[in-house]
């Protein structure tokens, strides 16, 4: 089995369905004997450039270990799902399990935002 990093972007109007999509895709990987090493839901983020006249999308990152047949199945699922705007599947040399830079930045900003909210509420 090979290691892959998968990133897909979902239409912002379909953000509620992202949890179901993640469950479906991870289920197909694990049913085929694959493993999920890292799963991150980055949430709705600004796009670098408009895609289909959209300026935001919901991002999901997965690092998996799976067979090529499972990856082909995922690629087909992404292609025929209208809610998936873009996807990228890259083969990696080893399993990546540490949090990504995006998640680290999000975690660093959370306490600062809470402190700012408390200051604003106190005023």
UniProtKB/Swiss-Prot annotation:
Would you tell me the Gene Ontology cellular component terms? cytosolic small ribosomal subunit
This chain belongs to the protein called Small ribosomal subunit protein bS6
Query: Matching Pfam families, A to Z?
Result: Ribosomal_S6
- Which species is the source of this protein? Vibrio vulnificus (strain YJ016)
Kindly state which keywords UniProt assigns to this record, in alphabetical order: Ribonucleoprotein, Ribosomal protein, RNA-binding, rRNA-binding
> What taxonomic ancestry is recorded?
Bacteria, Pseudomonadati, Pseudomonadota, Gammaproteobacteria, Vibrionales
Q: What family does the Swiss-Prot or TrEMBL record give for this protein?
A: Belongs to the bacterial ribosomal protein bS6 family.
Q: According to its UniProt entry, what is the function of this protein?
A: Binds together with bS18 to 16S ribosomal RNA.
Q: Where is the signal peptide?
A: none
Q: Which PROSITE patterns match?
A: RIBOSOMAL_S6 (PS01048)
